[in-house]
């Protein structure tokens, strides 16, 4: 069992101000694998003070120095990437096949993207007689979730370092071990003292202290809409910048001209990826009403072919849910779907056959779902798919947009131009055409209650900059 009780503050591993142990559980075995400390306000204050001290000098570092630092972080991260993949699998249950292919490498992708952007990005530009200057926003507080730990940590930390900001990170207490390893990577890479600080803790204590702290200039939060509202309320009195990536209930429109069987099976696999614990999962599958019987057959086949089991086994497609509370929530919502009259196509209540230990649920598909049902409105965050029939294309677009969320959308068509036309009408921050994956040089973020601001790529880097106008330069001479 690992002892990870220390916090990383001001370039050193330090003991918490007060002892408060918390057990980290492997959700596949329900066994304790590590102990961390839950921090308090004193720990946050110490970390913020370190970040505030470091900001004046780090914000003035040259572009070449920041690029060199990022390259060193990349080098160290690469040397420990297998350890990162194993750590993520232990702490949140994702299969090793997924942590090796995506969960661990995504951190490298964001670091490399930051270096790429800095190769051309202009921090100063002349607009007539005015110098438009982009400066680091300041001390940043990051509150990150457990479902894609390195994605959500590094897509914040990489642009913060790239722009000259300093950081206080509170990772999820359910999956803190990858963050602990990441702090070790930054330390080994030589990140200056105070530039990156990490304090473990829960949301109501450490998260709230970060959101409300008067010396933090920006808060970036990823998590539930409920928690996002609390973060925004805590941040409001200090009028700091707040960016949020919250929940989703993304629609997957399978158009009438799509290859139905291929589109349905691809949609099921995408919904179940990471055990359905992705905020942009395509959890509402919209199918032409006349084709629904065939779609149900394809969805049942895809669900029954999805193996939930030991994350270390090569044959495993999905692992457990991340914890006991998440297991209870998903089971409650599956039961709600049954109570409200949806037709169970595959899966259902209880653990998969032969599974006695771990927070595993059955890959579940519902048909005959109405868009006003609870399972079509609430973010379930588990491997649960809702199949919803539509009459025509206008009806499909209306259903897709009839949600309080707006993170992602999916459109499948045999005609890519047709898919693109429909994609432009989806009220969401990201739309995937014909199974296209997200690209790191794009951006990620949502409309409506899915949040505000953007992460990834150049748009994500811009979030960490203040725009200053300096008047009084010599106007350009006319030729």
How would you name each of these model-derived features?
Residues 1-28, 114:
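Hydrophobic face of amphipathic alpha-helices that form TPR/SEL1-like repeat modules
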Residues 15-16, 21-22, 38-42, 258:
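A short acidic/small-residue loop/turn micro-motif
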């Amino acid at each position: 069992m690992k002892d990870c009780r220390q916090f990383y503050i001001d370039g050193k591993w330090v003991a918490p101000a007060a002892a408060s142990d918390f057990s980290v559980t492997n959700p596949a075995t329900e066994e304790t694998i590590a102990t961390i400390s839950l921090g308090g306000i004193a720990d946050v204050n110490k970390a913020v003070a370190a970040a505030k001290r470091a900001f004046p000098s780090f914000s003035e570092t040259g572009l070449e120095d920041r690029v060199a630092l990022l390259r060193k972080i990349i080098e160290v991260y690469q040397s420990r990437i297998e350890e990162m993949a194993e750590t993520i699998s232990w702490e949140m249950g994702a299969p090793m096949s997924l942590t090796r292919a995506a969960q661990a490498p995504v951190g490298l992708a964001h670091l490399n993207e930051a270096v790429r952007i800095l190769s051309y990005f202009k921090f100063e530009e002349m607009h007539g007689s005015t110098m438009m200057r982009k400066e680091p926003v300041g001390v940043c507080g990051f509150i990150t979730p457990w479902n894609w730990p390195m994605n959500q940590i590094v897509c914040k930390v990489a642009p913060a370092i790239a722009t000259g900001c300093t950081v206080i990170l509170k990772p999820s207490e359910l999956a803190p071990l990858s963050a602990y390893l990441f702090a070790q990577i930054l330390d080994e890479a030589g990140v200056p003292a105070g530039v990156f600080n990490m304090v473990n803790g829960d949301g109501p204590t450490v998260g709230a202290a970060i959101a409300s702290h008067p010396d933090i200039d920006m808060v970036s939060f990823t998590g539930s809409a409920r928690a996002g509202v609390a973060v925004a309320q805590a941040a409001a009195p200090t009028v700091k910048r707040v960016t949020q990536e919250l929940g989703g209930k993304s629609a997957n429109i399978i158009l009438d001209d799509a290859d139905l069987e291929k589109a349905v099976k691809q949609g099921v696999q995408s919904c179940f990826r990471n055990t359905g614990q992705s905020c942009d999962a395509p959890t509402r599958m919209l199918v032409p009403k006349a084709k629904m019987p065939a779609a149900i057959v394809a969805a049942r086949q895809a669900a029954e072919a999805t193996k939930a089991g030991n994350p270390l086994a090569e044959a495993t497609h999905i692992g457990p849910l991340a914890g006991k509370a998440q297991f209870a929530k998903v089971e409650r919502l599956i039961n709600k779907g049954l109570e409200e009259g949806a037709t169970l196509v595959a899966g259902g209540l209880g653990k998969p056959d032969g599974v006695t230990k771990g927070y595993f649920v059955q890959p579940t598909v519902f048909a005959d779902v109405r868009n006003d049902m609870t399972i079509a409105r609430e973010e379930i965050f588990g491997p649960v798919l809702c199949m919803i029939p539509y009459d025509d294309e206008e009806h499909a677009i209306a259903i897709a947009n009839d949600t309080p969320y707006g993170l992602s959308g999916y459109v499948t068509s045999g005609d890519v131009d047709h898919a693109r036309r429909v994609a432009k009408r989806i009220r969401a921050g990201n739309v995937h055409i014909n199974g296209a994956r997200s690209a790191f040089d794009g951006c990620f973020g949502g409309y409506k209650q899915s949040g505000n601001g953007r992460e990834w790529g150049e748009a994500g880097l811009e979030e960490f900059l203040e725009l200053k106008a300096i008047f009084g330069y010599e106007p350009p001479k006319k030729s």
